[in-house]
């Protein structure tokens, strides 16, 4: 993108190219051509500078496009093949690139057309087009169904004025279907519904678990029912969804889509076996969006990624109930999901391990009422070393290159919990973080309640046990925006 007001994407791209000497060409797109006067007159006057720090040749996208033939001048290939590459979060500290086929993309668009949208629908999608849901589901479904889509800004929800004008945008474009994520719902609930949104029929939420209390607040404020779904970049996108028309189970991510199969597996005596109803295990999926055997561009990253050679092992933990509804209870992989965005804990851990006083570091996602999870890190010091959390916080600001990965809480422990082979045992750290965050939240509310423990429940996943004389509604008002469930502590 050519330098543009209120965007640092061009500057980041220039810096990236300067660090990649093998890049010889850059294709640049100028957003100003899509503006109308007087804005199109103003942009050239206030366009920020973007000094070129590389030797790559820069081409204008539209100039190149005008030189091309308007019809195919080669024989089109009829067989299926890779059509797109999308980066996805990983646990190794190195980016993974997922391969998406034409059939997988068409499948996602077909689902949107057949099950969600018609040519009468107006959809608002405040997700950026580098998000698989925006690109493969919404864009493809619009082409397939003839529905109309509104993308408020290139940055999605993060663009200026999106939240403050969201309800008015719905009224202006007579939106019937809202695409959202839990973080955005939380932000919208801090703003009054200041427009006529009676045109909205349904709202879809994905990317991260949706707290029950947030679900209820949105429904009460807007009169719109939220439909929760599940998908992932490695599967091109869609996996399951609560029925738009039919029984919706709040907290569940619904039923599998047509031509999708879901298995829940566990390891038993060294073998992978399928779980029984309501038994928690790893979620494995097979559908046209799964490029079995070739999910990632690097072959070694596809090793041990499949069950029975066709089911993608997602790394997510979940269960299927007696009605075949899918419930996600946790993650076998360690990714921190902040507002629907994946953060690799290795980014924080590797930075801190560069500090001379740090022997071990374990980064996790601690519960947050707005973002779902926020980065949190526990460290163990080298024998005899001394350092303060404040000093480590400053060290992170200087060495953690991804702003969203900066830890919101740093705690020094005498010794980190470890496995038998010496690896940091993160489930204990997650329980510790849940107890601390929930305790702080209860204390600040002034209610008579305390967290006695945090357990790993076979059906619910991690759950906080609370001792209190307060009624359930009072506790729900305080803790309901967290995705971690709570229950009364047994006597």
Task: List each language-model region with its residue ranges.
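Conserved AMP-binding/adenylation subdomain of ANL enzymes
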Residues: 106-125, 130-176, 191
């Amino acid at each position: 993108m050519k330098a543009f007001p209120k965007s640092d994407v061009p500057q980041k791209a220039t810096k990236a190219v300067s660090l990649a000497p093998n890049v010889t060409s850059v294709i640049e797109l100028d957003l100003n051509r899509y503006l109308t006067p007087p804005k199109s007159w103003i942009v050239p006057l206030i366009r920020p500078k973007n000094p070129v720090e590389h030797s790559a040749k820069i081409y204008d996208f539209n100039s190149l496009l005008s030189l091309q033939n308007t019809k195919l001048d080669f024989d089109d290939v009829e067989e299926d093949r890779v059509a797109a590459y999308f980066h996805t979060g990983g646990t190794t500290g190195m980016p993974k690139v997922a391969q998406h086929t034409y059939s997988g993309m068409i499948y996602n668009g077909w689902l949107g057309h057949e099950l969600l949208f018609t040519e009468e629908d107006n959809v608002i999608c405040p997700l950026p087009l580098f998000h698989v849901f925006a690109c493969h589901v919404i864009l493809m479904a619009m082409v397939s169904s003839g529905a109309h889509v509104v993308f408020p800004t290139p940055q999605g929800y993060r663009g200026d004025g999106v939240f403050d004008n969201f309800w008015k945008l719905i009224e202006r474009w007579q939106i019937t279907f809202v695409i959202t994520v839990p973080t955005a719902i939380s932000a919208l609930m801090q703003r009054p519904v200041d427009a006529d949104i009676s045109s909205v029929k349904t709202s879809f939420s994905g990317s991260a678990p949706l707290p029950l209390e947030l679900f209820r607040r949105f429904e009460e404020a807007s009169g719109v029912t939220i439909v929760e779904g599940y998908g992932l970049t490695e599967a091109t996108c869609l996996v399951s969804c609560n029925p738009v028309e039919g029984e919706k189970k709040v907290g569940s991510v619904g039923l599998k889509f047509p031509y999708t199969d879901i298995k829940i597996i566990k390891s038993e005596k060294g073998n992978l076996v399928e779980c029984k109803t309501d038994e928690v295990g790893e979620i494995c999926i097979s559908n046209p969006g799964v490029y079995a055997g070739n999910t990632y561009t690097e072959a070694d990253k596809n090793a041990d990624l499949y069950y029975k050679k066709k089911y993608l092992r997602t790394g997510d933990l979940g269960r299927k109930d007696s009605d075949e509804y899918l419930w996600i209870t946790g993650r076998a992989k360690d990714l921190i999901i902040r507002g629907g965005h994946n953060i690799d804990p290795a980014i924080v851990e590797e930075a801190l391990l560069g500090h001379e006083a740090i022997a071990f570091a374990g980064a996790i996602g601690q519960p947050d009422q707005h973002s779902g999870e926020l980065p949190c890190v526990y460290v163990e010091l080298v024998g005899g070393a001394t350092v303060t959390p404040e000093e480590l916080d400053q060290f992170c600001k200087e060495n953690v290159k991804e702003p969203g990965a900066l830890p919101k809480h740093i705690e020094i422990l005498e010794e980190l919990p470890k496995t038998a082979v010496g690896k940091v045992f993160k489930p204990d750290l997650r329980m510790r973080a849940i107890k601390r965050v929930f305790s702080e939240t209860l204390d600040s509310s002034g209610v008579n309640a305390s967290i006695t423990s945090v357990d790993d429940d076979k059906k619910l996943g991690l759950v906080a046990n609370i001792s209190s004389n307060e009624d359930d509604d009072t506790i729900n008002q305080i803790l309901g925006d967290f995705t971690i469930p709570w229950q009364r502590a047994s006597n």
